[in-house]
Amino acid sequence: MKKIILLLLLIACISCQKKEIVDILVVNANVYTVNDTFENAEAFAVKDGKFVEIGNSNNLKLKFKADTIINAQGKTIVPGFIDAHCHFLGLGLNQLNVDLTGTTSFDEVVNRVTDFQNKRQQAFIYGRGWDQNDWDIKEFPNNALLNSLFPNTPVVLERVDGHAILANQAALDLGNVTANSKIDGGEVVLKSGKPTGVLIDKAESLVMQHWPKPTKKELVAALLEAQNICLNYGLTTVDDAGLNQNEIEIIDSLQQAGILNIRVYAMVSATKQNLDYYLNKGIIKTNNLNVRSFKFYADGALGSRGAMLRKPYTDKPGHLGLLVNSIDNLKETAKRIANSAYQMNTHAIGDSANHAVLNTYKKVLQGKPNRRWRVEHAQIVSPEDFKLFQDIVPSIQPTHATSDMYWAEDRVGPKRIKGGYAYKDLLNAYGKVALGTDFPVEEVSPFYTFYAAVARQDLKGYPEKGFQTENALSRKETLKGMTIWAAYSNFEEDEKGSIETGKFADFIILDKDIMTVDVSEIPNIKVVQTFIGGISY
């Protein structure tokens, strides 16, 4: 009898124990924690914006009392997605201008510009998103039609990758661009000895340095619009690849005011002015902003034949591409950054550019371990250069492979294409890959990224057997690349990228299990809820 009484008293004491108060308790979920062992869980508790404990539903319900209880009803939860390379501000600014993405002909481009101007009546017309590779006539356009339609209004239409523009005569006149105009790292495209209006890479600056800069009001509107788009796709951190001081300061002020809630890893544009300022100031780190890297350009893009190759383009004999910055500039900039705590994140697409960047990194980083310098894109890499990624983070964008696969071999030929978009080879070299989209060059959707990485097909299932599937990633590798490995590439793996105790409660609820759903369904997955720091957006 005494034993029974003692047992009842013990049970009563346990039941009377005061539960720990938390803000959120999520139960009955299919949680991919993406921790070191890639454990699954079904519940977790959140307090003060961070994960408190992860485990099973019954145990956590016994231990915690929450202001908000979320019954996930078996839905899948993953860490918030991190886009390791995008143009967040650029996405927002695009919403204020002519959207030319998805156009299938130059006539459609012109029609969109005309419709836009009829509604907006702008003094300067700017658009972005055309790609001649998507047209029946896969050649650069000329500005003749724009000249006739807009004789007095400057028009600049930027190619989807940002590495070429089409400018009408009124815009060319702003920079006094003629057939004799020259600029290192750029090209003024001529036909019959006259400018066509197409300016490639640094030649864009001949016009754009005279173009009106966005106002602070426009920048704020753009950032908030971009945030709305990204949150709907489950992005909780964005790595913006190329920002100036005033733009970073606006981002910081909006975050401090609680208006901009998405977290931003800022790659500072590596201009002399920015280098001087930030190298002197040092790394800037808040919970929402991380300013610790410089974005440098080595070459242009493959689609506009500006990517720098070691041997001429297969479809343009004698042409090697463009070095946007000289090798001397690359080396000098790398030395400056190496003497600081900052990372250097360099755009390199062609095999020549990748070779130069990797060897420069190797030289200046001798005796400086764990600097996590990055190569952005790493699209065409010579076989002997993959080993140089042993200490360099490959920051890659899987949808580039499925967007470029239709014509990439035309550019570089059947031999070089084997070192193209070689994501598995890059993963094997470094042990991690940081995955992004490069939006607005590509679509924002991280589910397109995931699908492109694992299926190596376009949204119509082409090619049937996938594009160079020996370089496909597994679903586990892909999810890591969009979460913990992306966080690692930002020096943020201790605070985000996985669902673990002490980390920011950045997580998303999905309508389908991204790890088991039929691969063809991955692009159609929807985000049910996005949480940043335990707050639903």
Label each PLM-derived region with a short phrase.
Residues 12-15:
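C-terminal motif of bacterial Sec signal peptides marking the signal peptidase cleavage site
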Residues 514-521:
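Short, Lys/Arg- and Gly-enriched loop/turn segments at beta-strand edges
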Residues 254-263, 283-287, 340, 362-372, ...:
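Secondary-structure transition/capping motifs at alpha-helix termini
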Residues 17-27, 32, 36-277, 296-353, ...:
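Divalent metal-binding segments
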Residues 527-537:
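Short peripheral tails and domain-boundary helices/loops at the edges of structured domains
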Residues 2-7:
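Sec-dependent signal peptide recognition
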